């Protein structure tokens, strides 16, 4: 390719210029890679985290800026007295997870719940397509969404909405005796594609 830029330069006639091959990894490729590690009988946190780090590296500061702007736009439709809390939680635990994942080398390496992992594929692919913005070329928002859900569920073993997340009515995600409870979990129980089905929190009793 570079030789063709200087076809009349005799000094370049016998110059051996190596071919440069650029590999462009698309966000949707993550599902192919997830399927690959799913073929194993046992999947460790190290294997999954390595894959998540790989895809975090193709998320640029500009992608994070666009994702933050999108969440702020969606926040306009949240109740006014709940809006700032909503944005604080989602920006911190959604957008900022990318840096946390890249920096995370301190975790207990053990096998993840393979059955839940395998069952998550259709749900995650649905969410990926649902969150895609076709007006933005190679929109990374769906990728951030998927990475965050997998990281929180299988690496941290925490609910997708972090403890303390407040919902309208002053209801919150809670942890009691090592178990996680969400006040709105059952609202999505009939929606098989809801991300809540991946979340390990249980419905808060009595609500």
Segments the model singles out, each with a brief description of its role:
Residues 7, 11-14, 21-24, 30-207:
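Cysteine-centered metal-binding/redox modules
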